[in-house]
Amino acid sequence: MSFDILLSQNAREYLGALDEKSARIVKDNLRKLEEEPYPRPGSGSGDREKLHVDGEEMYRLHIGRTHTAFYVVLDEDQQVRVVEIVDIDEAHKRYGFD
């Protein structure tokens, strides 16, 4: 089963502001969500975590030590919707994650 990756306007703007190398790294990591968007502890498949933010279930993906993507998974539509991508420090400040 393959999921479509959809980026919000904010996520697209963040990507557009990155240098070419950083944008490539972020895109490569987001593409991995096409096959497996859910966290799989111990699998070595990236730093993903299920979160509850403002009563909504969403997921977090650390990309390197620089960026964090927040996304929701819609199984019935086979979609991963990337809600936001932010600098990792901003993610920690805003959401209080370690």
Where do the protein language model's features map onto the residues?
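Alpha-helical interaction segments
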Residues: 4, 28, 49-51, 60-62, ...
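A short, surface-exposed loop/turn module that caps and links secondary-structure elements
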Residues: 32-62
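Arg/Lys-rich, positively charged N-terminal/basic patches that mediate binding to nucleic acids
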Residues: 1-31
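Generic structural signal for secondary-structure transition and capping sites
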Residues: 23, 35-39, 90
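Enriched for short, Lys/Arg-rich terminal
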Residues: 12-17, 24, 56, 61-98
